[in-house]
């Protein structure tokens, strides 16, 4: 059975780039009747916050993602310690005592000599006495994973290709000799991303790892670690990344296009889903009405090689299309939460929906119709005409067709037509230059309110 995972770090509000990965995994699991695992990468105890864990759960629910299981890496430290000890005993995890400053100086020297800045495994040369001396100076070791890029002597590396058939990009190759042995454990004995991730993928029987192509190099290292643990390899698939229109990557620290902010601004969940999933693919970005329809057009192989640029203007356009197609029953509860209810609520929604881009913008038109207004939008030269229009307002209850009857009579009497006929009346009644059909607005306003607004001096 297909089993995928989404492993966010709860160190901030997740953004559109994060959620794209979540949606790719979720839709892939749905397409293959598999399972979707939510795994919080909360090994950074200081920066991980419960408020972000809660926010991620809310974001996923809003996007229609329902995890089959939830795990916390912070509750699995004993398991990571167990695996780390096995690797140490096998000589695959070795202690290093260089400081960050020493490593940086070494890197600069390598670059000045036009050499690749690869860690030289100097720590492997340390004797037991030298290690003891380092620790007596107060130095604590960080631990590196010994990459299998040598035959007998780890100080004599050779080209060692790790190959895999990527589910998105096809055959991929990483030369382990071109990489430094990765640090898996910091000086303070906390874990970096790699070891917990691989251990969890093994223990949780993850079959497919779908993520951004900035992880391709990591994959070479992780495959080596999977093999070191005698574990079965999952299928890897690397999709193109999302960037801003300026080509910058998204960041949780900058709160860039967080899902929370998009939701609070009033964007439709399905609009966010459609754009996040379809942008940067061979598929047209289409406003599918629900996730099931989006799933029918989802295919990992459709993603392009280049970075996809996410433009908020595209999201606004997509959102508009979707809102214009929403029926009253689709939004009834949300409108009620906006204090839009009553016997005219459905008629109101059908009248104004094609003139708004977000459901919450309906509040503006509800207030225009129901609240006391003091519009001053009519030009001075049109005010006499507005006053005159009262004499031609149809008798009785105003209906949709009343607008046509009214303006026809005014046109015949005054000679006005087009914009000079319609605009002053719209401005006097709504304070706006544009909006829903005036016939529908007349019915919503009612005769008494229409007369009151037209009578203002």
Curated annotation (Swiss-Prot):
ATP binds at residue 252. Pfam families: Anticodon_2, tRNA-synt_1c. One of its GO terms (cellular component) is cytoplasm. SUPFAM superfamilies: An anticodon-binding domain of class I aminoacyl-tRNA synthetases, Nucleotidylyl transferase. It comes from the Bacteria. Gene3D superfamilies: 1.10.10.350, HUPs. It catalyses: tRNA(Glu) + L-glutamate + ATP = L-glutamyl-tRNA(Glu) + AMP + diphosphate. It is an enzyme of class 6 (ligase). It is found in: Cytoplasm. GO terms for molecular function: ATP binding; glutamate-tRNA ligase activity; tRNA binding. GO terms for biological process: glutamyl-tRNA aminoacylation. Its EC number is 6.1.1.17. Its main location: cytoplasm. The keyword Transcription does not apply. Catalyzes the attachment of glutamate to tRNA(Glu) in a two-step reaction: glutamate is first activated by ATP to form Glu-AMP and then transferred to the acceptor end of tRNA(Glu). Monomer. Belongs to the class-I aminoacyl-tRNA synthetase family. Glutamate--tRNA ligase type 1 subfamily. This is Glutamate--tRNA ligase 2. The gene is gltX2.
């Amino acid at each position: 059975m297909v089993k995928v995972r989404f492993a966010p770090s709860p160190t901030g509000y997740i953004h559109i780039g994060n959620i794209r990965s979540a949606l790719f995994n979720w839709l892939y699991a749905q397409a293959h009747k598999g399972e979707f695992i939510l795994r919080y990468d909360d090994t950074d105890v200081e920066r991980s916050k419960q408020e972000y864990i809660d926010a991620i759960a809310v974001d996923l629910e809003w996007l229609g993602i329902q995890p089959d299981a939830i795990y916390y890496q912070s509750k699995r430290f004993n398991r990571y310690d167990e695996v780390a000890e096995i690797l140490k005993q096998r000589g695959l995890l070795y202690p290093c005592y260089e400081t960050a400053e020493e490593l940086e100086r070494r890197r600069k020297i390598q670059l000045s000599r036009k050499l690749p800045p690869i860690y030289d495994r100097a720590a492997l040369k340390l004797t037991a006495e030298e290690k003891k001396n380092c620790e007596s100076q107060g130095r604590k070791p960080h631990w590196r994973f010994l990459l299998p890029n040598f035959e007998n002597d780890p100080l004599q590396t050779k080209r060692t290709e790790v190959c895999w058939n990527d589910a998105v990009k096809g055959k991929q190759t990483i030369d382990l000799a071109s990489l430094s042995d990765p640090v898996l454990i910091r000086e303070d004995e906390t874990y970096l991303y790699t070891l917990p991730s691989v251990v969890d993928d093994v223990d949780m029987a993850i079959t497919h790892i779908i993520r951004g192509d900035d992880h391709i190099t990591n994959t070479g290292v992780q495959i080596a670690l999977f093999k070191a643990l005698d574990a079965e390899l999952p299928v890897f698939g690397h999709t193109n990344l999302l960037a801003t229109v300026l080509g910058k990557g998204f960041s949780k620290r900058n709160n860039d296009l967080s899902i929370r902010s998009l939701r609070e601004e009033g964007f439709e969940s399905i609009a966010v889903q459609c754009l996040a999933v379809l942008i940067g693919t061979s598929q047209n970005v289409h406003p599918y009405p629900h996730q099931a329809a989006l799933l029918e057009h989802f295919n990992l192989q459709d993603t392009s090689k280049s970075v996809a640029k996410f433009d908020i203007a595209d999201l606004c356009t997509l959102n508009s299309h979707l809102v214009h197609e929403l029926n009253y029953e689709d939004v009834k509860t949300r409108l009620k939460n906006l204090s839009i209810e009553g016997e005219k609520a459905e008629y109101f929604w059908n009248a104004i929906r094609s003139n708004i881009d977000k459901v919450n913008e309906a509040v503006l038109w509800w207030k225009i119709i129901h609240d006391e207004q003091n519009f001053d939008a009519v030009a001075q030269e049109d005010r006499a005409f507005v006053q005159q229009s009262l004499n031609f307002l149809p008798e009785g209850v105003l209906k949709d067709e009343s607008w046509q009857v009214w303006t026809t009579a005014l046109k015949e009497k005054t000679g006005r037509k087009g914009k000079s006929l319609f605009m002053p009346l719209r401005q006097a009644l709504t304070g706006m230059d544009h909006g829903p059909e005036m016939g529908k607005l007349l019915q919503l306003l009612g005769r008494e309110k229409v007369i009151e607004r037209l009578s203002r001096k």
